[in-house]
From Swiss-Prot:
Belongs to the universal ribosomal protein uS12 family. InterPro entries: NA-bd_OB-fold, Ribosomal_uS12, Ribosomal_uS12_bac. With S4 and S5 plays an important role in translational accuracy. Interacts with and stabilizes bases of the 16S rRNA that are involved in tRNA selection in the A site and with the mRNA backbone. Located at the interface of the 30S and 50S subunits, it traverses the body of the 30S subunit contacting proteins on the other side and probably holding the rRNA structure together. The combined cluster of proteins S8, S12 and S17 appears to hold together the shoulder and platform of the 30S subunit. GO terms for cellular component: small ribosomal subunit. Disulfide bonds: none annotated. It comes from Chloroherpeton thalassium (strain ATCC 35110 / GB-78). NCBIfam families: rpsL_bact. One of its GO terms (biological process) is translation. It holds the Pfam family Ribosom_S12_S23. Residues 101-128 are annotated as: Disordered. The lineage of its organism: Bacteria, Pseudomonadati, Chlorobiota, Chlorobiia, Chlorobiales. This is Small ribosomal subunit protein uS12.
Length: 128
């Protein structure tokens, strides 16, 4: 507990909060253009070909973003919307691409968790 004299001399200081997604500039999402779409492999215990894209954001920063879901229609020069959220087994990937917005299509034939993948509600007659 500081003395009054120490508070007068030094004052209180606020702890600075370091954001997990600095390229978003405190925005919930940002728009960007894909400069490269490719696959990469995850860290040690896992094995896969994860789909990622290099995206140049509207503020000029270039980031690597993960493309969630099965299958995608992205290619170079596609306009995408990115949100924060890292991929634990891909080092350096701190952003997700939002499916179903701008040039990104939703996941086809998705039935559960559709809102996270931009999939429309299936027609009632089209059951299995």
């Amino acid at each position: 507990m500081p003395t009054i004299q120490q508070l007068v001399r030094d004052g209180r200081y606020t702890k600075s909060f370091k954001t997990a997604s600095p390229a978003l500039d405190r925005c919930p999402q940002k728009r960007g253009v894909c400069t490269r779409v490719y696959t990469t492999t995850p860290k040690k215990p896992n094995s896969a070909l994860r789909k990622v894209a290099r995206v140049r954001l509207s503020n000029g920063i270039e980031v690597t973003a993960y493309i969630p879901g099965e299958g995608h229609n992205l290619q170079e020069h596609s306009i995408v919307l990115i949100r924060g959220g890292r991929v634990k087994d891909l080092p350096g990937v701190r952003y997700h691409i939002v499916r179903g917005s701008l040039d990104t299509s939703g996941v086809a034939d998705r039935r559960n968790g559709r809102s996270k993948y931009g999939a429309k509600r299936p027609k009632e007659g089209a059951k299995k």
